[in-house]
């Protein structure tokens, strides 16, 4: 795959569980062979039309199959989401607390979540779970996109101003 280069000696390959190896190969194939490119472009175009000057969106999902970079770059050479779709939050010590999540006009979620190997305790999972729990009091659903591979993206628009209590709820998750 152009996105994932793995060179392992044969003795290591024999020690990988076949089920996890098969799942990696499946996800890697989906990443390389973008049969959902038109759907990615549709999500990007929807956001481009609905985000005004100074407005942003936040994508909770951040893995090898779907991440903000895929949406920012799916219409190359045009990049209509540059400056409008920041990187997501998932790696402690590397990514800062996602203030851009609270500043975003729109939040993108994916179902099913997760889409790759990240554990349920990974920060993106925890942010997604808390968002799903609280979304009805802060956001409303405005669009969905079937990616054609079992994944559905939902776009949620913020309907209530951010409160200190909301930020602290996510911070202490």
Q: At which residue positions do the language-model features occur?
A:
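Short, acidic Gly/Pro/Ser/Thr-rich loop/turn segments
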Residues: 1-2, 163
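Membrane-proximal, lumen/periplasm-facing interface regions of secretory-pathway glyco-
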Residues: 2-49, 61-69
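Sec/Tat-exported extracytoplasmic proteins
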Residues: 47-51, 75, 111
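A generic structural signal for ordered secondary structure
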Residues: 50, 71, 155-157
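Extracytoplasmic
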Residues: 53, 58-104, 115-132
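Aromatic/acidic, Gly/Pro-rich catalytic loop(s) in extracytoplasmic/lumenal soluble domains
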Residues: 102-173
């Amino acid at each position: 795959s152009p996105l994932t280069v793995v060179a392992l000696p044969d003795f290591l390959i024999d020690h990988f569980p076949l089920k996890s190896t098969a799942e990696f190969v499946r996800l890697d194939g989906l990443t390389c062979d973008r049969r959902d490119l038109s759907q990615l472009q549709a999500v990007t175009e929807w956001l481009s039309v609905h985000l005004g000057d100074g407005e942003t969106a936040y994508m909770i999902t951040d893995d090898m199959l779907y991440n903000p970079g895929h949406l920012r770059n799916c219409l190359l050479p045009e990049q209509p989401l540059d400056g409008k779709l920041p990187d997501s939050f998932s790696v402690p010590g590397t990514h800062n607390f996602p203030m851009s999540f609270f500043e975003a006009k729109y939040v993108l979620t994916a179902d099913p979540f997760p889409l790759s190997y990240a554990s349920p305790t990974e920060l993106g999972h925890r942010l997604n779970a808390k968002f799903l729990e609280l979304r009805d009091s802060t956001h409303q659903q405005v669009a969905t996109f079937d990616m054609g591979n079992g994944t559905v993206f939902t776009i949620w628009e913020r309907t209530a101003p951010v409160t200190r209590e909301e930020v602290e709820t996510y911070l202490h998750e």
